[in-house]
Amino acid sequence: RQMCIRDRSQTNLFNEQFADEYDTILMLMNGSGIIGKLENLPDFFRKMKLLLRPGGCVLMDSSNLSYLFEEEDGSIVIDLAGDYYGEVDFQMQYKNVKGDSFDWLYIDFQTLSLYAAENGFTAKLVKEGTHYDYLAKLSRQA
């Protein structure tokens, strides 16, 4: 028997018309990336409040890029006056075809937890990976 998808859409997560409700929102394969920049986190959490049913959650993975700034002695040197070290400017290319550049956010768990708390969510560390990566569960505060 042939199976097919009957109801699909390609939608910008932040589009106002995207307003269904979900028990769980999966944001995997560095799911935090779509947020783009730290300054977009309040908008992200506002949108999650609209999309999540009561008791629902977001499962999101990301990575802490601080290891890229690690010195030989193990210290980490980050310019605190500069942009957040997990904000990355991506541009995809295949052979001679280049796409437009776009913002992508890698966020460490502590920073995610801080922004979650500031926006009415709790962040729980579900699993730590072997290379600075993690899975987090974001739930609305009661």
Explain the meaning of each model-derived region.
Residues 1-5:
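Short, small-residue-biased leader/transition segments that mark boundaries at the very start
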Residues 6-15:
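Conserved SAM-binding strand-loop segment of SAM-dependent methyltransferases
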Residues 22-42:
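A short SAM/SAH-binding and catalytic strip from SAM-dependent methyltransferases
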Residues 39-57:
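A short glycine-rich, Lys/Arg-flanked "PGG" loop and its adjoining helix->strand segment in the class I
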Residues 54-113:
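SAM-dependent methyltransferase
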